[in-house]
Amino acid sequence: MKIERCVYNPLLTPADVKPSRQDFKIDGVFNCGVTEYKGEVILLCRVAESVICKNEDEVCIPIVKKVDDKDEIQVITYRKSECPQLDFSDTRHVSKRGKKKSNILNLTSLSHLRIARSKDGIHFEIDEHPAIFPLAEEESWGMEDPRITKIDDTYYINYTSVTENGAGTSLISTKDFCKFERHGIIFAPENKDVTIFPQKINGKYVAFNRPVPCGIGNPQMWIAKSPDLIHWGEQRHFCGISSDT
C-alpha cells in the first residue's frame, strides 16, 4: 500500500476555528472522527479551548457545572504566587507538586466536538459553533477524541468523557449530524480509545477498548461484546506491548 502525505496539510488549524465564547481562545483542533454523509466528508473535531488570562500570575480553569438545573461554564482561577504546593509547569493541567500524573487537579482547557465538512476530503469548512458541548454530569472537564462508526442508517459516536473522576468512554448517535442522542457512559474510567466494529459478529456488537491499570499491568487492548451497544461485557485480552518495549 502506497501512502502519501497531503500537500495541503495541515487541513485545519486553530486559526480556522471560532471560539465558542469571546473570553476563550482555541488551543487546538485535532483527533477527529471521520465519515461520509450525503456526498460530503465529515470531520467531527475535538476543539480544545482555554480561558484568555490577562494576568501572567493567573491560571484560569474552565469547567462545566450544574447551576439551577442548567449546565454552565464556570472559571476557577489559581494565582501561582499563592499556591506553592501546586505545579503549573505543564500548561495542559494543574497538579500537586511531587505527585504522579494521577493527581491532576484540573485541566486548563475544555474540549467540545465540532463539525467540519468537505467535498473533496482536503478543503474543509468548519462550523462556527459547537455541534456537541459537554454536560456537567458526564463531561465536566470536556469531551475528547470522537470516533464514528456507521451501522445501518445510524452513525454512532464514541468519545472520551472526562470528569474529576477520570476519563471514560461515552456514546452518542445521529442520523443526520444535526440531531444527536446521548446514550451515556459505556466504558467506565479509565478506559478509552474505543473502536466499535461496523458489523455484528455472531449476533453481537464488538468493540476494542483500552483500560488503563494503575497498579499491575500496562494499558493494553481488550475486546468486548454487547447486545445493544450500551451494555458491554465478555471482556477478554486481545493484544498488548511486547516484553522488551
State what each model feature region is.
Residues 1-141, 149-195, 199-245:
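Beta-rich carbohydrate-recognition and catalytic domains
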